């Protein structure tokens, strides 16, 4: 871990959320003097670990998932303005709003975190993240395992969870591949792929 903001992309079910939770756990273990689950680790001490992981929707108080997330991120921003020794972990920022504004929100927050030189990791499924940051990508599906029936019990056989540097702005588009491998209704998936091809003629069908 080092100062600066890292944006992590990857396919659905590729372990991005688990990665953030693992980093959070490792940071706490290290600061309390315990071994961390790694062959080696370099982790500076921080005054606070701030996380936005999960859904804080509150129907009783009229908070949507998006509103709850924005309030939580706003509190993080206030904390970052006050101190620099902070670890910020944000999972799928702005995932519950439309892609255009969601992408802009990710860029704005990442730009803010980079400017304030805090340690931060932000996961996203949005393409077009142009704010200055380090970019990593979960490798995702093992290419020679594109066929077969994937279940929650054997998913680890299909996905490579390791990280690699990623200089591009596009994120993996593997939602349809996951749906096919999970055995979702073929008729519905074919309709979905027809719409995808209408929107993007260069888009290739998952199953030819």
Enumerate the language-model features and the residues they cover.
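ATPase nucleotide-binding head domains, primarily ABC-like/P-loop NTPase cores
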Residues: 1-208
């Amino acid at each position: 871990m080092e100062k600066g903001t890292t944006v992590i992309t990857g396919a659905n079910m590729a372990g991005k959320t688990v990665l953030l939770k693992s980093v959070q756990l490792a940071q706490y273990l290290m600061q309390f003097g315990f071994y961390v689950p790694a062959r080696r680790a370099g982790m500076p001490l921080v005054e606070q670990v701030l996380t936005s992981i999960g859904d804080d929707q509150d129907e009783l108080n009229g908070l949507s998932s998006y509103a709850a997330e924005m309030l939580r991120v706003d509190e993080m921003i206030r904390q970052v303005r006050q101190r620099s020794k902070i670890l910020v972990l944000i999972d799928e920022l702005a995932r519950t709003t439309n892609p255009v504004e969601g992408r802009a929100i990710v860029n704005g927050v990442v730009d803010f975190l980079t400017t304030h030189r805090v340690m931060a990791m932000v996961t996203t499924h949005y393409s077009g993240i142009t704010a200055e940051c380090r970019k990593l990508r979960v490798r995702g599906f093992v290419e020679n395992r594109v066929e077969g029936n994937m279940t929650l019990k054997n998913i680890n056989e299909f996905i490579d969870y390791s990280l690699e540097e990623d200089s591009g702005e596009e994120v993996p588009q593997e939602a349809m591949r996951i749906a096919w491998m999970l055995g979702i209704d073929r008729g519905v998936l074919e309709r979905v792929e027809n719409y995808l091809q209408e929107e993007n003629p260069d888009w290739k069908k998952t199953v030819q």
